[in-house]
From Swiss-Prot:
Its EC number is 3.4.24.82. Residues 52-212 form a propeptide. This is A disintegrin and metalloproteinase with thrombospondin motifs 4. Zn(2+) binds at C194, H361, H365, H371. The precursor is cleaved by a furin endopeptidase. The active site is at E362. Its cofactor is Zn(2+). It comes from Bos taurus (Bovine). One of its GO terms (biological process) is proteolysis. Keywords: Cleavage on pair of basic residues, Disulfide bond, Extracellular matrix, Glycoprotein, Hydrolase, Metal-binding, Metalloprotease, Protease, Secreted, Signal, Zinc, Zymogen.
């Protein structure tokens, strides 16, 4: 399910507080010159009165007017450009000049989209900077292509985004065509806006299974895409910036708190130019995600072994993304889609270096992680785990010691253990090398502010303590102020003489070396065996170990190998009085859950559903109502130790069907013979088979299958279009278990019989009507055939196995020596009696 990620104080953090009241203003402190810095605290804001519309009326179509003459063909862009621009009731005069330090051609990246053309002799891809209305505090940062303008304007505390309108007509003077001018919308202070929910179902695991409950190296081959707004904003520094952000995201995935060896690898970097070749990037985050997901699939190769294949794709954009009700959204992704070529994708609104955590957050969703405050995380996380980890719904500060919550670690582990990460097992051949230095060494505090709040922003140095939160300059109603998004300074940012930031703390540079030396992890000892999942009938118990001797540090290799082991327990038979099977008990537990099925007349009678359930879904609790026949997956997993199917001795373990012998021992090779004797040789039963041809209208008795019969098979063949014969089953008490009272069951179903035995029925409309089951039957069963017309070329055959009668042991005939011995014994007895009579 798509979702919207909201991060704290988006409206205030961007520096614009349009219509947000009340606000708290702290005493001013002096800064350079006569400017004042107003410290605004996000926590002081109450919900604003802004409407809930996802797109307030903050955009209009404008026609920029070029004032300094025409550009002559072949002469390139003039040294200075003047544009007049109407903007929300004001007139803006843009004074622009070429920025010689920005050249997109210097990027060793793939360029897609409409190639820049020499329109009117203008130099394609020219980056311009300048001021607005002569205000030295204003900033204009634009990409200029033959009159088309794309970029950001910051003027008197307002941020404006301008871009060409696709298909827009030129103005009457033949100047630039229509442009969209969008004022970055203020947002409410209502807190989290990310409403991601657990998807109703999981993607199907690949038949290419990984070793169960094992820690295996996973390589997330990633396509990184930047749109034209990113190119306009970052210019020549785009590649380095993107790789720096991805390096920080990869570092988060290397942290041992995720409890899996996951390597985020950039294999391809694409920059989109203006045009219609790329995805449609607009204010709607959901539509942008859908468009990007569809577009990126065309760039991928289906073969996972192909060097050009990627496992997931991320789009970075400077577009202000909006969700359902506000424009707080910083990213969007689908849940649990990492190996789905059509849906393994995410979008991220560039927000400075902290976008690394947004990217990690979105990839966490792709790995099936939910928000730390979700219902599914209750009981897994501690009371403070909903706000200090990567998957927090509102990210203020990520704990560097534990960036991933226990819930996130559990979800990604279960996701990978259940076979959904099959595409991540191949190691990439030619990944792009990510920066290994701390990002703060390349981007100082001033540059971090510019990346987050715009080109005119600078670091506010007067606010202690350093490193904990990055405060940056801005403007509000013409007044200078400081603003923050509560993100710490980037690691490696200088914070004093011979000092630099690390994890939000200011440390001496000598201490940083300890954070730059990788340390591989090692397995700790196996833990004790846990409780058995069943008291009888064959349960499962677990033992696990952790990567704690030592714990990996600084991106060191996480432990590989088996992390969980399991074994069978309590394999003895359950008491004969048990009326329900283990799976039947689990279905019956929902009989009175009327809250889940409010449209059904309650209570319901839920029984297991086997027919029509795919093998990969055998370990889901699929139940159907006995009366209505509707069936649902009531639980994504049955209890450990539940048989995978009535005809199988294999059992479910953590949602996976694991082989077990007929002795209920996991890994055992013992099998039932045709007599359903565990480990038998088939000699204790005999086969009975026959056919039936004496058809007359109504119900006809075919054969009585005795109690104890096994491997029952009944088949009648004939064209369904002319068939007039149908199978039926009658119980000893005269009631029907199948197709009684001239009522047929057309579709496949399981016929549940006394003694927890079931037969699989093909349905009356099947091409070959069949009944089959392993048995043994607990009581006799009468097989009947219902004749509803004139049978033509009908054939009905049946077979089953019945126990052989146990021979009564005969008394062995005595040998001659035995007779002589017994004769002498008898004579001796008679002699003694004779002597006793004489006395």
């Amino acid at each position: 399910m798509s979702h919207m990620d909201s991060h704290p104080g988006r409206g205030l953090a961007d520096g614009w507080l349009w219509g947000i009241q009340p606000r708290l203003l702290l005493p001013t402190v002096p800064v350079s010159g006569s400017r004042l810095v107003w410290l605004l605290l996000l926590a002081s804001l109450l919900p604003s009165a802004w409407p809930a519309s996802p797109l307030p009326r903050e955009e209009e179509i404008v026609f920029p007017e070029k004032l300094n003459g025409s550009v002559l063909p072949g002469l390139g862009a003039p040294a200075r450009l003047l544009y007049r621009l109407p903007a929300f009731g004001e007139t803006l005069l843009l004074e622009l000049e070429k920025d010689p330090g920005v050249q997109v051609e210097g990027l060793t990246v793939q360029y897609l989209g409409r190639a820049p053309e020499l329109l009117g002799g203008a130099e394609p891809g020219t980056y311009l900077t300048g001021t607005i209305n002569g205000d030295p505090e204003s900033v204009a940062s634009l990409h200029w292509d033959g009159g088309a303008l794309l970029g950001v304007l910051q003027y008197r505390g307002t941020e404006l985004h301008i871009q060409p309108l696709e298909g827009g007509a030129p103005n009457s003077a033949g100047g630039p065509g229509a442009h969209i001018l969008r004022r970055k919308s203020p947002v409410s202070g209502q807190g989290p806006m990310c409403n991601v929910k657990a998807p109703p179902g999981k993607p199907s695991p690949s038949p290419r299974r990984a070793k169960r409950f094992a820690s295996l190296s996973r390589f997330v081959e990633t396509l990184v895409v930047a749109d034209d707004k990113m190119a306009a904003f970052h210019g020549a520094g785009l590649k380095r910036y993107l790789l720096t952000v991805m390096a920080a995201a990869a570092k988060a995935f290397k942290h041992p708190s995720i409890r899996n060896p996951v390597s985020l690898v950039v294999t391809r970097l694409v920059v989109l130019g203006p045009g219609e070749e790329g995805p449609q990037v607009g204010p709607s985050a959901a539509q942008t995600l859908r468009s990007f997901c569809a577009w990126q699939r065309g760039l991928n190769t289906p073969d996972d072994a192909d060097p050009g294949h990627f496992d997931t794709a991320i789009l970075f954009t400077r577009q202000d993304l909006c969700g359902v009700s506000t424009c707080d959204t910083l990213g969007m992704a689908d849940v649990g889609t990492v190996c789905d070529p059509a849906r393994s994708c995410a979008i991220v609104e560039d927000d400075g270096l902290q976008s690394a955590f947004t990217a990690a957050h979105e990839l966490g969703h792709v790995f099936s992680m939910l928000h730390d405050n979700s219902k599914q995380c209750t009981g897994l996380n501690g009371p403070e785990s909903t706000s200090r980890h990567v998957m927090a719904p509102v990210m203020a500060h990520v704990d560097p010691e534990e960036p991933w919550s226990p819930c996130s670690a559990r979800f990604i582990t279960d996701f990978l253990d259940n076979g959904f990460g099959h595409c991540l097992l191949d190691k990439p051949e030619a990944p792009l090398h990510l920066p290994v230095t701390f990002p703060g060494k390349d981007y100082d505090a001033d540059r971090q502010c510019q990346l987050t709040f715009g080109p005119d922003s600078r670091h506010c140095p007067q606010l202690p303590p350093p490193c904990a939160a990055l405060w940056c300059s801005g403007h509000l109603n013409g007044h200078a102020m400081c603003q923050t998004k509560h993100s710490p300074w980037a690691d490696g940012t200088p914070c004093g003489p011979a000092q630099a930031c690390m994890g939000g703390r200011c440390l001496h540079v000598d201490q940083l070396q300890a954070f730059n030396v990788p340390q591989a992890g090692g397995w700790g000892p196996w833990g004790s065996w846990g409780d058995c999942s069943r008291s009888c009938g064959g349960g499962v118990q677990f033992s696990s170990r952790d990567c704690t001797r030592p714990v990996p540090r600084n991106g060191g290799k996480y432990c590989e190998g088996r992390r969980t082991r399991f074994r069978s327990c309590n394999t003895q038979d359950c008491p004969t009085g048990s009326a329900l099977t283990f799976r039947e008990e689990q279905c019956a537990a929902y009989n009175h859950r009327t809250d889940l099925f409010k449209n059904f007349p309650g209570p319901m009678d839920w029984v297991p559903r086997y027919t029509g359930v795919a093998p990969r879904d055998q370990c889901k609790l699929t139940c159907q109502t006995r009366a209505l026949g509707y069936y649902y997956v009531l639980d994504p997993r049955v209890a450990d130790g539940t048989p995978c199917s009535p005809d199988s001795s294999s059992v479910c373990v953590q949602g996976r069907c694991i082989h077990a012998g007929c002795d209920r021992v996991i890994g055992s090779k013992k099998k039932f013979d045709k007599c359903m004797v565990c480990g038998g040789d088939g000699s204790s039963c005999s086969k009975q088979s026959g056919s039936f041809k004496k058809f007359r209208y109504g119900y006809n008795n075919v054969v009585t299958i005795p109690a104890g019969a096994t491997h029952i098979l009944v088949r009648q063949q004939g064209s369904p279009s002319v068939r007039s014969l149908y199978l039926a089953l009658k119980l000893p008490d005269g009631s029907y278990a199948l197709n009684g009272e001239y009522t047929l069951i057309p579709s496949p179903t399981d016929v549940v019989l006394p003694g927890a035995v079931s037969l699989r029925y093909s349905g009356a409309t099947a091409a070959s009507e069949t009944l089959s089951g392993h048995g043994p039957l607990a009581e006799p069963l009468t097989l009947q055939v219902l004749v509803a017309g004139n049978p033509q070329n009908a054939r009905l055959r049946y077979s089953f196995f019945v126990p052989r009668p146990r021979p009564v042991p005969s008394t062995p005939r005595p040998t001659p020596q035995d007779w002589l011995r017994r004769k002498s014994q008898i004579l001796e007895i008679l002699r003694r009696r004779s002597w006793a009579g004489r006395k």
